[in-house]
Amino acid sequence: MSYNLTDPYEIARYIKEAKKSTPIKAYIEGDLSNCDFTNIEKFNSGDLYILFGESEEILVIIEKNKDKIKNCRIEQDRRKSAIPLLDMLKINARIEPGATIRDKVIIGENAVIMMGAVVNIGAEIGEGTMVDMNAVVGARGKLGKNVHLGAGAVVAGVLEPPSSDPCTIEDNVLIGANAVILEGIKIGKGSVVAAGSIVTTDVPENVVVAGAPAKIIKEVDVKTKDKTKLLDDLRK
């Protein structure tokens, strides 16, 4: 079944209809030689087993063979998850440990996703853009090229409340730490959003905004550009 992931209601339907998954990894010491491992990925040497699969299938094996099991340890990082995580092996970008990126996103060349950052379904991260520590890019949020999304900043998504227009951050924008860009807002090219600002209306190109709600305080000048320049070495 196909879904139009530009529509928040279609995204919600996709999540609703997706098969929910609770994958686990089990380390087992015992005799499981007579078990049926259909649909389970198994690695073993002698009485040592590592099993990857859905919890309901692995837990059945453990319960039925508990008298043959000496030791068991289970690792789990999600429950009834609807959307898988992105296969990062296919991405030519720097993605640090602890970043959470859902499937069906676009990550541009030489982008940087830092520890603790969250990128939700349908989001687009442009070439050379950095999503700093603990920043959030909500569903369908669009970040252009060479954007810096500061630590703890939020680009709101389209899901709750539903919004037909995603947040759009154009090229060469700098968003300071802990700033919040509300649903459907557009930030024009080259603009700067000061740390801690709450942006409730569209921002034109090449201006600096600050405050809650954010207001234009000046145009971007040479001094501003020098203070907010990006470091190419971080994107190599």
Curated annotation (Swiss-Prot):
This is 2,3,4,5-tetrahydropyridine-2,6-dicarboxylate N-acetyltransferase. It is an enzyme of class 2 (transferase). GO terms for molecular function: tetrahydrodipicolinate N-acetyltransferase activity. PROSITE patterns: HEXAPEP_TRANSFERASES. Its EC number is 2.3.1.89. Pathway: Amino-acid biosynthesis; L-lysine biosynthesis via DAP pathway; LL-2,6-diaminopimelate from (S)-tetrahydrodipicolinate (acetylase route): step 1/3. GO terms for biological process: diaminopimelate biosynthetic process; lysine biosynthetic process via diaminopimelate. Disulfide bonds: none annotated. Catalyzes the transfer of an acetyl group from acetyl-CoA to tetrahydrodipicolinate. It comes from Clostridium botulinum (strain Kyoto / Type A2). It catalyses: (S)-2,3,4,5-tetrahydrodipicolinate + acetyl-CoA + H2O = L-2-acetamido-6-oxoheptanedioate + CoA. Keywords: Acyltransferase, Amino-acid biosynthesis, Diaminopimelate biosynthesis, Lysine biosynthesis, Repeat, Transferase.
